Amino acid sequence: MIEFHDVHKTYRVAGREIPALQPTRLNIQAGQIFGLIGHSGAGKSTLLRLINRLEEPSGGRILVEGEDVTALDAEGLRRFRQRVGMIFQHFNLLSSKTVADNIAMPLRLAGGFSRAEVDARVSELLARVGLSDHARKYPAQLSGGQKQRVGIARALACRPSILLCDEATSALDPQTTASVLQLLAEINRELKLTIVLITHEMDVIRRVCDQVAVMDGGAIVEQGDVADVFLHPQHPTTRRFVFEAERVDEDERHDDFAHVPGLILRLTFRGEATYAPLLGTVARQTGVDYSILSGRIDRIKDTPYGQLTLALVGGDLEAAMSQLNAADVHVEVLR
């Protein structure tokens, strides 16, 4: 578990104090993929780098697996960082070293490994990230996705229990992003690693994360299960991220329905309810007619969900609303 107890960070610039992270309390459970999302300057990179003390906190306590990281001396911090891997937006590979040598670097710096042990570990990691045929290549000979896979392999070299991902997919095209996210999900599942990633894309959170914290102005403004936050956003910042991910402007969508008669609802289905023939049943039993104005079915990690915007007219509208609410469907009245 990673715990933040009133952790905050302030920079001093030209005699002025600039807060980067407001006092923050946060719990990240072991084995989760935890996402931090926010626009530039929201404080997410600062928070991530506080975990392994690449940034020093101005106050508060950080506990990782029960150990007070803020109290570690230089030697204790060095040993602790061997348990925390990190991957970066721009890969940070050594251009003069081969793929194999880049992956081996943390093992050689840590010491205590024979050449045979290093070579065996590098071969194992190359196979895990799908680059067994690229050991003798140099970074300049690789695609962006391949470079990031090398970065992931290097981060795993010392068998960490935590993996920090600093905008690991923002420099990649959509197809490569999907493959890297799939690799991270496999690593989390098979190695039981705790992964903390930061991003400015809600789609990245939706694909792989279990929990999410939304950041704005150096503070966590919303936090919870990804499905709950994605499907029922409360804070304006979260709502903007969700509607950007859906490529829908909320105000324009409401304007599109101005001419539509009846009660306009947005229904959100989750899990098995996504595929249930609910609307037909409600219409038959209550005598209402409905028009589907928009709809989509997608997945949040492994959970299917559906969203429908529809207009109800005629019949017993109150009974229809009651049946929808009773069916474990989230109902939002738009008009």
Curated annotation (Swiss-Prot):
Classification via Gene3D superfamilies: 3.30.70.260, P-loop containing nucleotide triphosphate hydrolases
Domain ABC transporter span(s) in chain numbering: 2-242
Function: Part of the ABC transporter complex MetNIQ involved in methionine import. Responsible for energy coupling to the transport system.
SUPFAM superfamilies: ACT-like, P-loop containing nucleoside triphosphate hydrolases
Reaction(s) catalysed by this chain's protein: L-methionine(out) + ATP + H2O = L-methionine(in) + ADP + phosphate + H(+); D-methionine(out) + ATP + H2O = D-methionine(in) + ADP + phosphate + H(+)
Membrane topology qualifier: Peripheral membrane protein
Gene name linked to the record: metN2
MF terms in GO: ABC-type D-methionine transporter activity; ATP binding; ATP hydrolysis activity
Top-level taxonomy: Bacteria, Pseudomonadati, Pseudomonadota, Gammaproteobacteria, Pseudomonadales
UniProt keywords, alphabetically: Amino-acid transport, ATP-binding, Cell inner membrane, Cell membrane, Membrane, Nucleotide-binding, Translocase, Transport
Protein family: Belongs to the ABC transporter superfamily. Methionine importer (TC 3.A.1.24) family.
One Pfam short name: ABC_tran
Assembly and binders: The complex is composed of two ATP-binding proteins (MetN), two transmembrane proteins (MetI) and a solute-binding protein (MetQ).
Location in the cell: Cell inner membrane
Stated name of the protein: Methionine import ATP-binding protein MetN 2
Cellular component aspect of the GO annotation: plasma membrane
Top EC category: translocase
Record-listed ATP binding positions: 38-45
Its EC number(s): 7.4.2.11
